[in-house]
């Protein structure tokens, strides 16, 4: 058994774990292991995790962040897609009886069912993750469009993506992820994390972002799933205008084009405008108009 005198988030211990298990990181999974304890303290503090909280973690890796979460939280439910890491996590987290690791792809998991199976639904629920850069947007979009309510979400991601979360309409950074976040959450960048504190070092710097649930909206779409569908379609081809992207979603039959134009008229939106110019409220109005035009 490896010595557990050092935290996992230590360059020497991280390399020792990798050496012991002959672990080579998979670039295809965006694996970079965090080795800075100050960053981990900051993540836990930013999430304001207490002993009454349940925490969902995405991508525990070799357990560096998981260890810190387990020390602070009531229970941690971690989703790890790479089955090579399961025996490593069994070893590195052996001292913690409040951690459950499941070998599942978070994008395919029934999150609500897993929470009901493994966690006490009466406790506050938070999500914390060091997200792989290549799949940050799909994971966040999936979480934000899902039916699980988190008190807050604290994620480490590529700084460029973090900048998008609080972007304004009409800017290059504004996109589907911006709208998905701003529909439900307030975004706050807590810390910029240099690439040098990872093994191996990624090619870009990271940032810790806290997303906090907003009060219930007074202006809501007729159906949230339809709303997110329209948002994704609007940004499917950024260089195309809204008219062309809506045709890609609904089709180019004459009657469909007529219905799309009807919806745009109802919403008083210029068909030549690009999605990046629309606010969250305008996307809600558009979604309802598409419903009125029998397209949704």
From Swiss-Prot:
Q: Which SMART domains match?
A: rADc (SM00650)
Family annotation (NCBIfam families): ksgA (TIGR00755)
UniProt xrefs under Pfam families: RrnaAD
Enzyme class, UniProt record, top EC level:
transferase
This chain is encoded by the gene named rsmA
Which reactions is this enzyme annotated as catalysing? Answer: adenosine(1518)/adenosine(1519) in 16S rRNA + 4 S-adenosyl-L-methionine = N(6)-dimethyladenosine(1518)/N(6)-dimethyladenosine(1519) in 16S rRNA + 4 S-adenosyl-L-homocysteine + 4 H(+)
In Swiss-Prot or TrEMBL terms, this protein is called: Ribosomal RNA small subunit methyltransferase A
Major place of residence? cytoplasm
The enzyme's E.C. designation: 2.1.1.182
Organism, as annotated: Lactiplantibacillus plantarum (strain ATCC BAA-793 / NCIMB 8826 / WCFS1)
InterPro entries found in the cross-reference section: KsgA/Erm, rRNA_Ade_diMease-like_C, rRNA_Ade_Mease_Trfase_CS, rRNA_Ade_methylase_Trfase_N, rRNA_adenine_dimethylase, SAM-dependent_MTases_sf
């Amino acid at each position: 058994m490896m010595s557990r005198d050092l935290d996992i988030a230590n360059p020497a211990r991280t390399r020792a774990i990798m050496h012991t298990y002959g672990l080579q990181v998979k670039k295809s999974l965006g694996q970079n292991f965090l080795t800075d304890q100050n960053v981990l303290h900051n993540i836990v503090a930013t999430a304001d995790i207490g002993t009454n909280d349940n925490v969902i973690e995405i991508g525990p890796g070799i357990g560096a962040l998981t260890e810190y979460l387990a020390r602070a939280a009531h229970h941690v439910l971690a989703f790890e897609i790479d089955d090579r890491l399961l025996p490593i996590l069994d070893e590195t987290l052996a001292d913690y009886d409040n951690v459950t690791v499941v070998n599942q792809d978070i994008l395919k998991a029934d999150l609500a069912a897993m929470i009901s199976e493994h966690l006490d639904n009466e406790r506050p629920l938070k999500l914390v993750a060091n997200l792989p850069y290549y799949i940050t947007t799909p994971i966040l979009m999936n979480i934000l469009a899902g039916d699980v309510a988190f008190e807050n979400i604290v994620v480490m991601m590529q700084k460029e993506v973090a900048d998008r979360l609080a972007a304004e309409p009409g800017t290059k950074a504004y996109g589907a992820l911006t709208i998905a976040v701003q529909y439900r959450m307030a975004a706050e960048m807590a810390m910029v994390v240099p690439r040098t504190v990872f093994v191996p070092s990624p090619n870009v710097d990271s940032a810790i972002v806290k997303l906090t649930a907003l009060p219930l909206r007074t202006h809501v779409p007729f159906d949230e799933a339809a709303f997110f569908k329209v948002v994704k379609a609007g940004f499917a081809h950024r260089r195309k205008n809204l008219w062309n992207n809506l045709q890609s979603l609904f089709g180019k039959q004459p009657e469909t084009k007529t219905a799309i134009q009807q919806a745009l008229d109802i919403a008083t939106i210029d068909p030549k405008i690009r999605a990046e110019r629309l606010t969250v409220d305008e996307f809600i109005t558009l979604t309802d108009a598409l419903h009125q035009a029998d397209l949704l």
